[in-house]
Amino acid sequence: MSTILESLPTGQKVGIAFSGGLDTSAALHWMKLKGAVPYAYTANLGQPDEDDYDAIPKRALEYGAAGARLIDCRAQLVAEGIAALQSGAFHITTAGVTYFNTTPIGRAVTGTMLVAAMKEDGVNIWGDGSTYKGNDIERFYRYGLLVNPDLKIYKPWLDQTFIDELGGRAEMSEFMRQSGFAYKMSAEKAYSTDSNLLGATHEAKDLESLESGIKIVNPIMGVAFWRDDVKIAAEEVTVRFEAGQPVALNGVEFKDQVELLLEANRIGGRHGLGMSDQIENRIIEAKSRGIYEAPGLALLYIAYERLVTGIHNEDTIEQYRENGRRLGRLLYQGRWFDPQAIMLRETAQRWVARAITGEVKIELRRGNDYSILSTKSPNLTYQPERLSMEKVASTFSPRDRIGQLTMRNLDITDTRDKLRVYTQVGLLTPGEASALPQIKGDSGE
């Protein structure tokens, strides 16, 4: 039997992830009028563009919900965000600028915590506002069924009856007005925004065109650093980690990591730090484009990565980066709690993050322009005296280096022989005008 219901299950409890926006408000009221028993569940993810969370469940009750709950997801969201940071679970980058997977992290938390709350209320049918072309429909599907194997999925936006009756925002707004609710449709923006405490995503509409750039976006977590009229003063900030956990900013210790991240957002946001423009592959392999904000995570990541490179050896760092990219893809695909993801994450947290103790001082300027001013850690393996060009007691002598270089003759000879073979079989065409090495046979030809 399919877990996806294509028509409204009348007479049954249906949980809906309720944001309080037009789409979910109209869907909830429509389900009530059509004979379902809707329950509303709102996730408090610390969205920077949400002013009054307590009012959202109240509105759901007004629109016909049989029950409405506000679930505080902030602590879990930050915990998962720091876990992603510790394991470098970020696979989307452009020219060294990173997308911090803030929406996928938010979906992992929302999808599990809301369905767990529904299960407590005996609600085994779940709906949300994700569309069939996006990533979220699959992410929520996976996370929901992980938590509740008996879960059925009903999405109004996959129900043709709902689409025929309320196919667009104008129709939904008129539907709410005719139902007696003074619901005023918000002004249309040139793009769509989704946010949580970790970051914001701006996409769709005008941003679907690659001829539209970051300048059409109005940041909600920082400043428009590209505008000449936005004054941004350089600022020095220190970030301290202990055993892989961020614990202090500018010497102020935080016992609550939610509060620490909020302060990191304020600091980074003053400079527009962590904004990026990315073209990515959705789960279904089609490409999409997004403008992202993540000022706090970006600030923490600069300090964390600096300590990683100063503490760990090259092979460990290589594994951390390779596994981080793999883990980032799994996170993006809605597999954050799959066994293979847990294995990669736990490995990084145990063998990389636990050694990360220290303090980094950073100068922030505009956007992603910054300088690292100092790095301190009791665990640093960076020892400049080993390689000092001054006359100091050395860990090895000139004769030691002569011996090491002499041993390199073996692989240099092997490389020369292989290049000769490639030339003989026509893979290389050496010549004076070629950038390839000049390979001569034994005869000197």
Swiss-Prot record:
Q: Name one GO biological process term.
A: L-arginine biosynthetic process
So where does ATP get bound?
Answer: A17, F18, S19, G20, G21, L22, D23, T24, S25, A43, G129, T131, D136, D194
* Coiled coil (UniProt feature): none
**What's its catalytic activity?**
L-citrulline + L-aspartate + ATP = 2-(N(omega)-L-arginino)succinate + AMP + diphosphate + H(+)
The principal localisation class reads cytoplasm
Known EC number: 6.3.4.5
What metabolic or biological pathway is this protein involved in? Amino-acid biosynthesis; L-arginine biosynthesis; L-arginine from L-ornithine and carbamoyl phosphate: step 2/3
A Pfam family that the UniProt record links to this protein: Arginosuc_synth
Q: Which SUPFAM superfamilies match?
A: Adenine nucleotide alpha hydrolases-like (SSF52402), Argininosuccinate synthetase, C-terminal domain (SSF69864)
Reading the lineage from the top rank, the first entry is Bacteria
The entry's cellular-component GO terms read:
cytoplasm
Which residues belong to the signal peptide in this entry?
none
Question: What PANTHER family does this protein's entry cite?
Answer: ARGININOSUCCINATE SYNTHASE
* The protein's name: Argininosuccinate synthase
Organism encoding this protein? Burkholderia multivorans (strain ATCC 17616 / 249)
